[in-house]
Amino acid sequence: ACLVGSEMCIRDSNCYCEFVGKKEPIEVGADICVGSLIKNLGGGIASNGAYIVGRSDLIHLCSERLNVAGEAKEVGPSLGANKMFLQGLYFAPSVVASALKTNVYAAYLLEDLGYEVSPKWNEEKSDIVLAIKFNDRNKLIKFVEGIQSASAIDASCVPIPTKMPGYDDEIIMASGSFTQGSSIEISCDGPLRSPYIAYLQGGLTFEYGKIAVLKAIENIK
């Protein structure tokens, strides 16, 4: 929640969640909702950008803050990005469906192998993220390395645990994506601390996601 003047507003960060459920936050009470276009809503096509949706008066305030006071959404360059934004939005439902299929597939296989996963393959999803508990430092590292080795870009690179700003522990991350930082393509990361949980998300196509999951599982056997 946040204050706008003297009014309390409900603000939601919707990253990883778009098109997963039947309703979006603004349909169930949120006043304003924000998210990234290099995640679900960009459909793997948008290479940058973010979005804001919600009450028109709040959108107006945001546009004045982000652009120019008094001009709001009436002016401002698009820098030729509108095509990829709209094309990404067009493909987003299908891409998110593929990411969810990858999530279910990975959850089923890993649970069958004895690993604790959340959510389980047959549980309702609220986002595209799958948490996998390894209880083993080396297996976490090997799983993330497996995802990287099946990535479309930089498959030959080997992720190395390292310190990152904002974290107390070393982080290992696989993200061999066409767009740097994109998590809808296929990515996996986790902190190097007990119980050694990896967070898997994405899959532009189920076929692509399936190969990455199988490669990662093969790497921890």
Language model regions located:
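Conserved C-terminal alpha-helix-loop-beta "cap" of PLP-dependent enzymes
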Residues: 111-220
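General beta-strand structural signal in soluble alpha/beta enzymes
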Residues: 11-14, 33-36, 119, 155-159
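Fold-independent oxyanion-binding glycine-rich loops
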Residues: 12-15, 36-38, 55-56, 189-190, ...
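Conserved active-site segment immediately N-terminal to the catalytic lysine
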Residues: 25-40
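Active-site C-terminal subdomain of aminotransferase-like
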Residues: 38-139, 212, 216-220
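Single conserved hydrophobic/aromatic residue that forms the stacking wall/gate
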Residues: 1-5, 9-10
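Short, solvent-exposed amphipathic alpha-helical segments in soluble enzyme
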Residues: 26-27, 51, 67-68, 145-151
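Catalytic cores of alpha/beta
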Residues: 19-25
